[in-house]
């Protein structure tokens, strides 16, 4: 079977699937992505691309995401055209097209079915736009968000089928597309993600926690409102007051992956540390951890 994976941040959601497909010598697996020199998957041929340019600074700001998606889509088209000229025609195209890479693949491979990862469809109402600010969106925000969906609608139209991890994510999409989207969770590698009775975590202060301790954990790539960090920190204050033996361990970075930076420019972690009153002897923070270390944090956790 010939399989084409598409994701700008290889392997994205396809870490396990690409590995399994690549391990079968009967398969020919290609993965197109932005330059990722350190990422290699045995049996998978990685093909890198770079966007030819950035959006024009003079473009209407509503159109910036769409313009950027078009440039990425053009480069993905060029890469796939070279693959096709070399004889590679996939039996299936599997990708997360939320950045534009899938926009023109049907023009290269009109007969190859496309399976798209439908992560999110934006809405100004009852969704993510202002949920933690407790206010109505402005008319400008409504227009910007509606326009941002332009190329996502193209993806929904051109994909033969879509998958999304949760019913919440499905319900963000227009109802007319529900029949072509399956709710399918990313899954868990149950051979790797397992309990470990002797798991232990050495904290930044040098002390050690194990599964015998009362531990609550929070793990996120970045500490930000979109990932529930503000809510968690306010809950942490209550937990530490009501559970005198409890330790809280958090893992994550200070960047912003979704939404906006704090108006002050400070990391949300610093802002929340000023707001809440925590027993710092029982509140422990790690930055980003290697995967095996992060698993040990989860293994000692009573509640996450």
Model-found features: residue ranges?
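Acidic donor-binding loop of glycosyltransferase active sites
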Residues: 160, 299-304
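Carbohydrate-associated surface elements
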Residues: 168, 187
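Conserved donor-binding/catalytic core segment of Leloir-type glycosyltransferases
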Residues: 202-227, 233-238, 248-249
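Nucleotide-activated donor-binding/catalytic signature segment of Leloir-type glycosyltransferases, i.e.
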Residues: 252, 256, 261-296
